[in-house]
């Protein structure tokens, strides 16, 4: 049965681009968003006809753009990365910052939790990758064989049998690092422009990367090789694998594309109807993506400050 995605509702509350989104398996009615307005919002999802949810709590503390956010696997904590050069660990039940992570010398662009939530990795415009413990101590800074330009994205593999970190940069490289030694395992070469995003499949076997060249490259993390590429035909801002279907979603500067990885074809292309867009002004672009844990809802953050929720439906 073929499937498609339908716009189910919106979440409005940010006063800047929605740069990042995170969901929780433990708290299916919660969504976390980070924004250029320097704040994060914990949303309570109601899935009503009129509003898909409401802001339950706003997290203040960063003094510049929030670039990335992630929720711990137990749903109790969140991490945020900011252009104020710091990371923050938040207790979601109270909305308080429990730790500040200070050490990067330029904007922090990306943050990720290890599968056991005991380690944290961050990537920055200072061209370094830092590993931290949850107490806020920097345990290691990766510079040897590191990126020669901004580090745009860092992600831990969820697979405990192959504990690696994947990073991407404006030097057009995807790098895979062995977690135990923090040594470079593989340089994945092939992109012709800067890379904005990497994402790892739920089982840790696949990695996808995308950016300026409009091509999504898929890499086998177990065999350390390039598998194939999918053309999105436009700059890619964000990528995310579905948690329960063999799909990859790419947010580009013109639409959101859902790829079926088995058929290597497009399942759907999502483009909302934007109101009040003049001929000269640019249409809002999707710059962040997150799936609900059950894989039924795709959350998309846009440059018009709105989060849109798309639901998977069977085609009639």
Swiss-Prot record:
Component of the small ribosomal subunit (SSU). Mature N.crassa ribosomes consist of a small (40S) and a large (60S) subunit. The 40S small subunit contains 1 molecule of ribosomal RNA (18S rRNA) and at least 32 different proteins. The large 60S subunit contains 3 rRNA molecules (26S, 5.8S and 5S rRNA) and at least 42 different proteins. InterPro entries: G-protein_beta_WD-40_rep (IPR020472), RACK1-like (IPR045223), WD40/YVTN_repeat-like_dom_sf (IPR015943), WD40_repeat_CS (IPR019775), WD40_repeat_dom_sf (IPR036322), WD40_rpt (IPR001680). Pfam families: WD40. GO terms for molecular function: G-protein alpha-subunit binding; GDP-dissociation inhibitor activity; protein kinase C binding; protein-membrane adaptor activity; ribosome binding; signaling receptor activator activity; structural constituent of ribosome; translation regulator activity. The keyword GTP-binding does not apply. GO terms for cellular component: cytosol; cytosolic small ribosomal subunit; nucleus. This is Small ribosomal subunit protein RACK1. The lineage of its organism: Eukaryota, Fungi, Dikarya, Ascomycota, Pezizomycotina. Component of the ribosome, a large ribonucleoprotein complex responsible for the synthesis of proteins in the cell. The small ribosomal subunit (SSU) binds messenger RNAs (mRNAs) and translates the encoded message by selecting cognate aminoacyl-transfer RNA (tRNA) molecules. The large subunit (LSU) contains the ribosomal catalytic site termed the peptidyl transferase center (PTC), which catalyzes the formation of peptide bonds, thereby polymerizing the amino acids delivered by tRNAs into a polypeptide chain.
